[in-house]
């Protein structure tokens, strides 16, 4: 048998494994080691089996040098870290790759179980919620919440740094990634209530919420609604209520969420242009990361319930009343948990100018504008974002 054959190791690692998360899944994941060889893992009803070769259209394709693939399968190198380090690329269903990575036993690897990123699911507010977990199980909980039309994979850059000291949980929002959509009305308060339900199912102590964009708004709503459950907040370019540019409110208000049920296909080129536009300098990120993100976006919006959820969330953020008894900006001063706001100097979606309004509403909060940064600081400036986050956490 050639020494570059990964099949025996794949079979050894997958022998006897079962994933409840994959119980209803039939899929194929292909490992490709350059031009050397290809192996496929067939997933069916929670179990996985390996073989040589590749199907014509695999669900997911993982590419890396053979030594990297070998280390990942052996459990010596977390697949998430290999992806973040640019040593491994994923095309297709990224969530499937994360789930399969969790099947490889890494209990003997350096760092023990605390170095792992697990995939899990829980019922939160009646919604089957898919989430990632990393770090010591008895450490203080930190919850990462992603933005609109993304998945928990968009929070991956923060997990390695935070999971050394904290128990990190990263759920998919309802109607995103692996979390089901049960309601068409995905207003910010609804997402805040769902997030509180998730906390109560997964933790027994107050958690720090770290949210990007819509995830930041959901975190704010959770803290406003139930401050006793929230130890602190780190808001990365949070989707606050519009104070101006509300001319289209009458039209958007009568536009039903069901419009999104139409099977409209978003051209990949258009989606890519929109994604790259979120960054101050799109060249900072490898092309492989953009491709993986677009694959996830296409997968999410290809399903009707998810399209409804994404459109509903977008519509409700725009329609949010800025002022008045139920208005966001008049409720914000009642926020009591400590909060750190990070804004992107060149954010085209949530302008950094919102920082001064937040500072007026929350004199006890802290706002930092990150220079040369767009809407996704955890990807564009991961080290600085992690550094500021850890400093904030240490002060709680």
Where are these regions (language model features)?
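Feature captures hydrophobic
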Residues: 1-119
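Alpha/beta-hydrolase fold catalytic core
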Residues: 95, 99-142, 164-166, 203-205, ...
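Active-site loop/oxyanion-hole signature of alpha/beta-hydrolase fold enzymes
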Residues: 124, 170-210, 214, 246, ...
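Conserved HGGG/HGGXW glycine-rich cap/lid loop of the alpha/beta-hydrolase fold
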Residues: 127-178
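Flexible "cap/lid" loop of the alpha/beta hydrolase fold
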Residues: 224, 233-265
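Conserved alpha/beta-hydrolase catalytic His-Asp/Glu region
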Residues: 266-331
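Acidic catalytic loop of the alpha/beta-hydrolase fold
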Residues: 322, 346-350
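Short beta-strand/loop motif that positions the catalytic acidic residue
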Residues: 335, 341-343
């Amino acid at each position: 048998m050639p020494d570059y054959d990964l099949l025996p190791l794949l079979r050894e690692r997958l022998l006897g494994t079962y994933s409840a998360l994959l119980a209803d899944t039939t899929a194929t994941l292909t490992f490709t080691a350059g031009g050397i060889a290809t192996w496929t893992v067939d997933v069916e009803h929670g179990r996985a089996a390996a073989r040589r070769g590749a199907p014509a259209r695999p669900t997911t394709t993982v590419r890396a040098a053979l030594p990297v693939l070998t280390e990942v399968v052996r459990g010596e190198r977390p697949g998430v870290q290999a992806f973040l380090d640019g040593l491994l690329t994923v095309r297709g269903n990224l969530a499937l790759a994360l789930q399969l990575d969790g099947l490889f036993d890494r209990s003997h690897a350096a760092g023990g179980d605390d170095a792992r990123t697990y995939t899990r699911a829980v019922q939160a507010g009646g919604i089957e919620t898919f989430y990632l977990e990393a770090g010591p199980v008895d450490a203080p909980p930190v919850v990462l919440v992603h933005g609109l039309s993304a998945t928990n994979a968009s929070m991956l850059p923060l997990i390695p740094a935070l999971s050394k000291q904290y128990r990190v949980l990263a759920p998919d929002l309802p109607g995103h990634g692996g979390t089901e959509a049960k309601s068409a009305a995905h207003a910010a308060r609804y997402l805040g209530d769902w997030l509180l339900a998730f906390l109560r199912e997964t933790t027994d102590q107050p958690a720090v919420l770290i949210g990007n964009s819509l995830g930041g708004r959901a975190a704010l709503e959770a803290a406003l609604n139930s401050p006793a459950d929230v130890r602190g907040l780190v808001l990365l370019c949070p989707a606050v209520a519009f104070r101006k540019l509300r001319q289209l409110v009458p039209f958007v208000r009568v536009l039903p969420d069901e419009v999104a049920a139409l099977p409209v296909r978003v051209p990949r080129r258009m989606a890519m242009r929109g994604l790259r536009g979120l960054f101050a300098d799109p060249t900072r990120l490898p092309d492989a990361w953009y491709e993986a993100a677009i694959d996830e976006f296409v997968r999410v919006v290809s399903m009707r319930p998810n399209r409804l959820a994404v459109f509903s969330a977008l519509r409700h953020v725009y329609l949010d009343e800025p002022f008045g008894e139920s208005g966001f900006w008049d409720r914000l001063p009642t926020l009591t948990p400590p909060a750190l706001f990070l804004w992107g100097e060149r954010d085209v979606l949530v302008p950094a100018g919102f920082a001064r309004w937040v500072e007026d509403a929350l004199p006890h909060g802290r706002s930092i504008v990150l220079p040369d940064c767009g809407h996704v600081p955890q990807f564009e400036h991961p080290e600085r974002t992690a550094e500021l986050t850890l400093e904030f956490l240490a002060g709680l």
